[in-house]
Amino acid sequence: FEIEDAWQIIETGQPMPARNADSHDVLGTFQIVASRREMRRTPTSSDDLIELLQDRHRIMMAARPDRNPGMFKMQNNHAGDSHFVDCMLVRGTLRKGYEFYQALEHPFAKALFMLFMVSEVHPFNDGNGRISRIMMNAELVAADQSKIIIPTVFREDYLNALRRLTRKGD
């Protein structure tokens, strides 16, 4: 979407007829990120992390029942040469990841860890990038820090950085 199109969808609450499902993705994402209360919620336990991820994903993907909103993937997924966590290991990996997250103190460190963990696990069939950025920004909002917005023009730089972390471990 162009910015103007997304703004119209948000302002009117009406999807664009030619892109109904995509429009609802915009509305669902906006519903989460526009809520100060929702964006101040951060996980307090590994169970809470799982519930928070599933709740936010359910809202974000509500218009796409074929993508199983709020349900963790049932098949392994990959993007190009990046293969993500096995579908049978998603919950356990998130639980273990929460232990590392819990040890972090600085909000920025927590935000980046949350972004990377969710992106690396890729727990859902679709919407993993958006949900990882929502989780990252929730950490920042909860600490009264500025949100991080990744403009489309920097999309490749952002994805290349994630790929490098995934593949080279640095």
Residue ranges of model-derived segments:
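FIC/Doc superfamily catalytic core
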Residues: 1-170
